[in-house]
C-alpha cells in the first residue's frame, strides 16, 4: 500500500441505515485522488461489494440519462441489510472527468451514443482503472465477494484480488436512458 494514505473511519447515517466511511488517498505522479469506501461495520466473510465510479450528474443530481444514481442507491440498500461495502472511485464519466463528460453529453444531445461521444472528444469508451480497488480490497482483507455489477471489466479486474461471484444490479430503463443501456449491453458487453 505504498501509494495509499488511509483516513480514519467515521459514522455515516443514511436513509438506508448506518454506515461507516473511510477515505483512501491515491498518490501518483499526477498528484493525488481521494476515493471513498462506504461500509457496514461487521460484514460477512463473503460480503456484497459495489465498485462504483463517481457520477455527479446521476449520484447527486438524479440524472435520468444514466443508471448510476439508482444503481448506487440499490447497492446501498442491499449492503445495509446484508453487509458489505461500496468502493466509490473518483473516475467521473468513465474516467474522462466532469468537464469532458459535459462535452460528451452535448454530443449525445445531438444523437451520438455514449461511446461515439467519448471517441469524438478523443477518449476511449472507458478510461477507468480499477487497480486501486484491488488495493482497497486487500486493506479490508477481502478474499471473497459478491460483486454487484453488470460490467465484465469490473469482474475481470477484481478477480485478480479475490474470488468474485457476480450478482446483477438491474436498473429499469426510462425514456432518457434506454439507448444508453442498450449501448452498454451491445457495445460494452454489459450483462443486462
From Swiss-Prot:
HAMAP family: RibA. Zn(2+) binds at residues 55, 66, 68. The keyword Nucleus does not apply. Its cofactor is Zn(2+). The active site is at residues 126, 128. Belongs to the GTP cyclohydrolase II family. Keywords: GTP-binding, Hydrolase, Metal-binding, Nucleotide-binding, Riboflavin biosynthesis, Zinc. Pfam families: GTP_cyclohydro2 (PF00925). Its EC number is 3.5.4.25. Pathway: Cofactor biosynthesis; riboflavin biosynthesis; 5-amino-6-(D-ribitylamino)uracil from GTP: step 1/4. This is GTP cyclohydrolase-2. It catalyses: GTP + 4 H2O = 2,5-diamino-6-hydroxy-4-(5-phosphoribosylamino)-pyrimidine + formate + 2 phosphate + 3 H(+). One of its GO terms (biological process) is riboflavin biosynthetic process. GTP binds at residues 50-54, 92-94, 114, 149, 154. Binds 1 zinc ion per subunit. Transmembrane segments: none annotated. One of its GO terms (molecular function) is GTP cyclohydrolase II activity. Catalyzes the conversion of GTP to 2,5-diamino-6-ribosylamino-4(3H)-pyrimidinone 5'-phosphate (DARP), formate and pyrophosphate. The keyword Coiled coil does not apply. GO terms for cellular component: cytosol. NCBIfam families: PRK00393.1, ribA.
Amino acid at each position: 500500500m505504498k501509494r495509499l494514505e488511509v483516513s480514519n473511519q467515521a459514522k455515516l447515517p443514511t436513509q438506508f441505515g448506518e454506515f461507516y466511511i473511510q477515505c483512501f488517498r491515491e498518490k501518483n505522479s499526477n498528484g493525488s485522488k481521494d476515493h471513498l469506501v462506504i461500509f457496514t461495520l461487521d460484514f460477512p466473510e463473503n460480503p456484497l461489494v459495489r465498485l462504483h465510479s463517481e457520477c455527479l450528474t446521476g449520484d447527486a443530481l438524479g440524472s435520468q440519462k444514466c443508471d448510476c444514481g439508482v444503481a448506487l442507491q440499490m447497492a446501498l440498500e442491499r449492503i445495509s441489510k446484508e453487509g458489505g461495502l461500496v468502493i466509490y472511485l473518483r473516475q467521473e464519466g468513465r474516467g474522462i472527468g466532469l468537464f469532458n463528460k459535459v462535452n460528451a453529453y452535448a454530443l449525445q444531445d445531438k444523437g451520438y451514443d455514449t461511446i461515439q461521444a467519448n471517441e469524438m472528444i478523443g477518449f476511449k469508451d472507458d478510461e477507468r482503472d480499477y487497480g486501486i480497488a484491488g488495493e482497497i480490497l486487500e486493506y479490508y482483507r477481502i478474499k471473497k465477494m459478491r460483486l454487484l455489477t453488470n460490467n465484465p471489466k469490473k469482474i475481470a479486474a477484481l478477480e485478480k484480488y479475490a474470488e468474485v461471484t457476480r450478482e446483477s444490479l438491474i436498473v429499469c430503463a426510462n425514456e432518457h436512458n434506454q439507448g444508453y443501456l442498450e449501448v452498454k449491453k451491445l457495445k460494452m458487453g454489459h450483462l443486462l
